Amino acid sequence: MFIVKHFKDLSVDEFFEIAKARYEVFACEQKITQENDFDDTDKKCYHIFSLDNNIITSYARIIPKEYSSYEDTSIGRVLVNKNYRRNGLAKKLMMNSIEFITNNLNEEHITLSAQYYIKDLYKSLGFKEISDVYDEVGIPHVKMRL
C-alpha cells in the first residue's frame, strides 16, 4: 500500500523515516551530498511512500507543475530501499505516482530526470527520452516525459 501526503501533512516520524531513506540511498550508496538532495522544494511537494514495519521501502516526491523546474508536474528522488529491490516495487511506486498525478492534480504530462541506468523502467511506463544524456551530481541522467 502506498501513502501520499503533502509535506505539511507528514508526521515528524514520517519525515524522519523519509530523510533516513533518502540519506541511505542518495548519500551513502550514490555519494550525493545532502545539499544536492534536500531543498525547499520538499515543502511544496507531495511525498509518496510504502512502509514495512515502519521502514520506508520505496519513496518519491511529486512536484506540482507550479513548483517544478520543468513545464510539467515532475517526479523525483525516486528510491527503493536496498533490501526491497528486484521485486517490482519501483514500478509499483511509479504507477501509483502517475495515478495520483492524473487523478488528483489533473495533469496528463509528467517530466522527470531519470538516472540513465534505470531509464528502461520509465520507458516501460510510457516515458520517452527528450534529451541527450547529461551529468547531474556526477551521475548520468536523461530527461524523460510521459
Label each PLM-derived region with a short phrase.
Residues 1-37, 42-56:
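Short amphipathic alpha-helix that is part of the acyltransferase structural core
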Residues 49, 55-65, 72-79:
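Conserved beta-strand in the GNAT
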Residues 65-75, 85, 104-108, 138-140:
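A conserved beta-turn-beta hairpin within the catalytic core of GNAT-like acetyltransferases
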Residues 80, 86-99:
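Conserved acetyl-CoA-binding loop-helix of GNAT-fold acetyltransferases
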Residues 83-85, 121-124:
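Acidic/histidine-enriched, beta-strand-rich ligand/metal-binding domains
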Residues 93, 118-121:
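Conserved short alpha-helix immediately C-terminal to the canonical SAM/SAH-binding motif I
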Residues 94, 101-114:
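Conserved GNAT acetyl-CoA-binding A-motif
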Residues 111-113, 123, 128-143:
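Conserved catalytic-core motifs of GNAT/GCN5-like acyltransferases
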